[in-house]
């Protein structure tokens, strides 16, 4: 069974943001603006994305 993945792209800078939000971006594997990573679609990852929703864009992959 194929697992669902999400394509997460950082769209805004982390400079001047809350330290916990910066740590969340690091936890997602994002380093800079326009950096894109593919992550597994799990509740914990969804929670991380919801925390920094204003700095990332998300696409669902099959």
UniProtKB/Swiss-Prot annotation:
GO terms for biological process: translation. It comes from Shewanella frigidimarina (strain NCIMB 400). GO terms for cellular component: cytosolic large ribosomal subunit. This is Large ribosomal subunit protein uL30. GO terms for molecular function: structural constituent of ribosome. InterPro entries: Ribo_uL30_ferredoxin-like_sf, Ribosomal_uL30_bac-type, Ribosomal_uL30_CS, Ribosomal_uL30_ferredoxin-like. The keyword Ribosomal protein applies. Belongs to the universal ribosomal protein uL30 family.
